[in-house]
A protein has these predicted regions:
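A short core secondary-structure module
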Residues: 170-209
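Flexible, small-/acidic-enriched active-site or ligand-binding loops
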Residues: 155, 203-232
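A short, Trp-centered hydrophobic/proline-enriched beta-strand micro-motif
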Residues: 136-144
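Alpha-helical interface subdomain recognition
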Residues: 1-98, 108, 120-125, 132, ...
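A short, charged helix-loop
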Residues: 224-250
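Short Gly/Pro-enriched turn/cap motifs at secondary-structure boundaries
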Residues: 133, 148-151, 175-178, 190, ...
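Short glycine/proline-enriched turns and hinge-like loops at secondary-structure junctions
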Residues: 83, 152-154, 178-182, 219-221, ...
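N-terminal glycine-rich flavin-associated loop
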Residues: 104-124, 150-153
Length: 397
């Protein structure tokens, strides 16, 4: 008869609760594939890319990510991989363990631009854009946020007006990931009939995009301002099925889902760096892992990662089974990003002065997560979304 100890599995420091046990062999294989690509193509270079604020051969990297099906991987058909929500979440976790900027490239492409076309676009839109976007040979961006409009998209100032059978767009969008490298932009604008979405090829006359400089976060990600000055589009450019805020908000929920997984990757990488460093760093004649306060920090970080992983998996399974409520995504995004940011800050204290060096991943992840906490819904907005669900009382104004 086997003893209890023979049934025990080896503990994973960042997964003490055993989320890994609840994954299928295929899901683990997806995770391993993405991790291997990140270790080969991203990890050796990411510190330098972050420091310089530029990725070497970004088009080439996009094609390599497209080869393993990362763009729109949870969408069906049109060259997309058609994988599960959990598969996609695990991929986001591995990508963000390398860098939030790389995960942003993938999630904006797949969960915002491609999802908008796949869910709300015409068949012509899907056939024209999605195969190239899935392959990474065409890049998309998503224009919703404006210089003076963030959490309240209903107040957007970008306008689309009819001119004969055409639409003419005027306005600007701000903090747009992939904007100045995009081949196509999904632009949301106010019309006489409410907010509508448009598929805008970036070669269209009157469209321009300027990269935003002097960032201290997401430096390995392209962030841009979009300018639309008399951008003339045919009537077919409109997303036919997206009327009102339902369209853009559904896209944001897709992106938030990837974020709630991805943030755990950044937290995991920072925790692992702190654990490894603490085991090697000697003070007062012993490794600092032997001190109670260090152990308390490591334990707290590990427990938060374990809880966050189980939460992400529960949300992912609900999404795959068609029973996910949007509020649950807000719960995951709020909890996991906040926890990951706290983990990075705690890990930095363990590394001491080395914690601010790009020779280690911690300060890079910490800076990145300051942005992740804000985009696709601030922590305050997600708090109010959850609060309304609990009380039935909206408190947004």
């Amino acid at each position: 008869m086997m003893t209890l100890s023979e049934h025990r599995t080896e503990l994973i420091p960042y997964d003490l609760a055993g989320m890994d046990h609840h994954l299928t062999a295929d899901e683990r294989a997806v995770r391993s594939t993405v991790r291997a690509v990140c270790e080969e193509l991203i990890d050796p270079n990411i510190g330098d890319w972050f420091e310089r604020g530029q990725i070497d051969d970004l088009p080439g990297l996009a094609v390599e990510l497209g080869k393993i099906g990362l763009f729109g991987m949870h969408l069906q058909g049109y060259g997309c991989a058609g994988m599960s929500a959990v598969d996609y979440g695990l991929a986001c976790m591995e990508l963000e363990a390398s860098d939030s900027g790389i995960r942003s490239l993938v999630s904006v492409q797949g969960s915002l631009a491609m999802f908008a076309i796949h869910r709300w676009g015409s068949e012509e839109h899907r056939e024209h854009w999605l195969p190239a976007m899935a392959a990474g040979t065409a890049i998309g961006c998503f224009g919703l946020t404006e210089p003076d409009v963030g959490s309240d998209p209903s107040a957007m100032k970008t306008r689309a007006r009819r001119d004969g059978s055409d639409w003419v767009l005027d306005g600007s969008k701000m903090w747009i990931t992939n904007g100045s490298i995009a081949d196509v932009a999904i632009v949301w604008a106010g019309t006489e009939d409410g907010i509508r979405g448009f598929v805008v090829p970036t070669t269209t006359a009157g469209f321009s995009a300027n990269a935003i400089r002097h960032k201290m976060s997401l430096r390995a990600s392209v962030t841009s301002e979009l300018i639309l000055e008399g951008v003339r589009l045919p009537s077919t450019a409109m997303l036919p099925d997206a009327v009102g805020l339902r369209g853009p908000l559904s896209c944001l929920n897709e992106a938030r889902y990837g974020i709630l997984w991805g943030a755990l990757g950044a937290g995991r990488a920072s925790f692992q760096a702190a654990l490894d460093y603490a085991g090697q760093r000697t003070q007062f004649g012993r490794p600092i892992t032997g001190f109670q306060l260090t152990q308390q920090k490591l334990v707290d970080m590990s427990i938060e990662l374990s809880k966050g992983g189980l939460l992400a998996l529960a949300i992912g399974r609900a999404k795959d089974e068609g029973r996910l409520h949007p509020v649950q995504v807000s719960v995951g995004k709020l909890n996991n990003v906040r926890a990951a940011l706290d983990i990075c800050r705690t890990a930095r204290t363990i590394l001491g002065a080395n914690g601010i060096s790009l020779e280690y991943p911690v300060i890079r992840h910490m800076n990145n997560l300051e942005s992740v906490l804000t985009y696709e819904g601030t922590s305050e907005m997600h708090t109010l979304i959850i609060g309304q669900a609990l009380t039935g009382q909206p408190a947004f104004q």
